[in-house]
Amino acid sequence: MKYKIFASTTPQTEPVLQKLKQVLKGCEAVEKGFDYLFVLGGDGFFVSTVANYNCHNCRVVGINTGHLGFYTSFNEKDLDDNFLQKLQQCHFQRISLLEVSVNGQQHLVLNELAVYTNTAYPINIFIDGEAWEFYRGSGLLIGPRTGSTALAKSAKGAVIFPGIDVLQIIEMNPLLHPNQVTIQSPIILPKETQVEFVVKKAFNPQQFPTFYCDGRKLELPNADTTLALKLVQSTPMFNISLKTQDFINKLKSTFIKQS
């Protein structure tokens, strides 16, 4: 078995990294052509590492050393003599990512594209070529199912269970007055839907919105800009559980506190 490891630099990750290397002692560490890509860290590190990493047919394995673990299947206690056997029993599959096409470049997104504006700068939204909204507010989020427990949840979006392959748009603090009323609710769209955000050049460049793909800022010029958004299949394969019980347990341990 050939493998590659990406590990966060947090203190709690280092002992887990050494333990993983020991477990993989009989395997071959390579830079290219690997069968498995091991990602050690929390969900934030996983997202920043994996979405745009183009490894065809490699299997991505998340090992949690952080707080959230929606993308990780293992933790330190799983790194025992039976780890490789557990790995062979895992089910890997391709998942939907959000493809953001702008200015001739494509960016892949695991959680969300976030659009921010501190001046309620207008954004035209089109769904499958049809004008949907002339939006003004503090920002917009759009992302695949996997992002529904991230920033989307904080913005009062829907938490979407595994097995439902959809696209979600969320308005953040929409500007409302008699002549400007938007839907004010999360929108859940079928996976084949194509969305466009259209932004006109600002007279004052400082008013132009800012765009972030999974927290990475897109350096876009102040100009007429169209972002084409759709779901695409990942080239790597992921071991993200589709079991309802697993997802419920993660939601309860992360977000729900009851006495």
UniProtKB/Swiss-Prot annotation:
GO cellular component: cytoplasm
Compartment list: Cytoplasm
Source domain of life: Bacteria
Cofactor needs: a divalent metal cation
SUPFAM superfamilies: NAD kinase/diacylglycerol kinase-like (SSF111331)
Predominant location category: cytoplasm
Active site per UniProt: 43 (proton acceptor)
Catalytic activity: NAD(+) + ATP = ADP + NADP(+) + H(+)
Molecular function (Gene Ontology), one example: NAD+ kinase activity
Annotated GO biological process: NAD metabolic process; NADP biosynthetic process
Keywords of this entry: ATP-binding, Cytoplasm, Kinase, NAD, NADP, Nucleotide-binding, Transferase
Residues that bind NAD(+): 43-44, 111-112, 136
Family (UniProt): Belongs to the NAD kinase family.
Xref: HAMAP family: NAD_kinase
Function: Involved in the regulation of the intracellular balance of NAD and NADP, and is a key enzyme in the biosynthesis of NADP. Catalyzes specifically the phosphorylation on 2'-hydroxyl of the adenosine moiety of NAD to yield NADP.
Alphabetized PANTHER family for the sequence: NAD KINASE
Name this protein carries in UniProt: NAD kinase
Organism of origin: Mycoplasma pneumoniae (strain ATCC 29342 / M129 / Subtype 1)
Gene that encodes the chain: nadK
